[in-house]
Amino acid sequence: MTSLFRRSSSGSGGGGTAGARGGGGGTAAPQELNNSRPARQVRRLEFNQAMDDFKTMFPNMDYDIIECVLRANSGAVDATIDQLLQMNLEGGGSSGGVYEDSSDSEDSIPPEILERTLEPDSSDEEPPPVYSPPAYHMHVFDRPYPLAPPTPPPRIDALGSGAPTSQRRYRNWNPPLLGNLPDDFLRILPQQLDSIQGNAGGPKPGSGEGCPPAMAGPGPGDQESRWKQYLEDERIALFLQNEEFMKELQRNRDFLLALERDRLKYESQKSKSSSVAVGNDFGFSSPVPGTGDANPAVSEDALFRDKLKHMGKSTRRKLFELARAFSEKTKMRKSKRKHLLKHQSLGAAASTANLLDDVEGHACDEDFRGRRQEAPKVEEGLREGQ
């Protein structure tokens, strides 16, 4: 069945009959295969997929013949299809029994295909040629141009060990995680929130000593009263930092009596709430003289400041009055001091001016006297010269 793979020299029109006639002659030169066509785009498929498709298209052909033709054409789909069609047409006139008998013989394979398949590095030693994967399961041969094979991504292991190591370290770098943050981290406390909402239009007040809690009423009157209270508390806090004002408060008998009443009220309320606190209060008040012996000034000042924390409304009013009186006194003292300094500076300037006048006057008198004494001497000299 060598005529299945050879083309007679009589032309393309009688190719089938000429091939059948020349089957007995073994000296006919093999003609060119059907894959010598004008240059066109070569389509390649995956090997197993192409073999399955060709077996479906040519069920009468043997699997080994299809594989040999495909390998001879280096996986070119169009050339393989043309050659298989030509072989199928040429083998159509012959009987199936002869075809089956001669399919296993080496004479049924063209010598070109046989040479390529029987080379030392055959399919047993090397894998089949690489074919591009099929784009479609159906209609594989309908596409005019094949898709380009996808380029595999570059392997990281194959790169150099210089820069990639740093990149790998950078990729594997995990930032250190912080521990659990406190509950009040970046949070506004409720009292701060109330003060911000109440005083949104003005400057933000700080939490001064004795500052009352912010009222919930949104009215302008309440806001004004809060502002006044805040300013008064700030002034009182500043006054309490003045040692002279503190000494004046300790010398004021009425204020000390009111402060003592407030302290007793606070202690009675505290004793009602808990009986243990009463013993602590009495124990705290009894050793005051003992501590006063060690450092009486510090202990008295600390005790007085502790009493100021429990002031009532009446005592607070007295404190405001005393603070106003103290501020007026200090203003008067400052104005008197400025006045005295001004007078002293003016008196010093006048005295220096008088001293300068006296010095200049004495100098002028001496010059005038010296000139009067020199005048008659000059006249006598002139007369003698004449």
Curated annotation (Swiss-Prot):
PROSITE patterns xref list: CUE
Pfam families: CUE (PF02845)
Biased composition (Low complexity): 1-10
Cross-referenced CDD domains: CUE_CUED1
Disulfide bonds: none
Domain CUE: 46-89
Encoding gene (name): CUEDC1
Gene Ontology terms for molecular function: ubiquitin binding
Organism: Homo sapiens (Human)
Name assigned to this protein: CUE domain-containing protein 1
Transmembrane segments: none
Region annotation Disordered: where it falls in the sequence: 1-40, 147-172, 195-225, 367-386
Higher taxonomy: Eukaryota, Metazoa, Chordata, Craniata, Vertebrata
InterPro entries for this protein: CUE (IPR003892), CUE_CUED1 (IPR040195), CUEDC1 (IPR040192), UBA-like_sf (IPR009060)
Comp. bias intervals (Gly residues): 11-27, 199-209
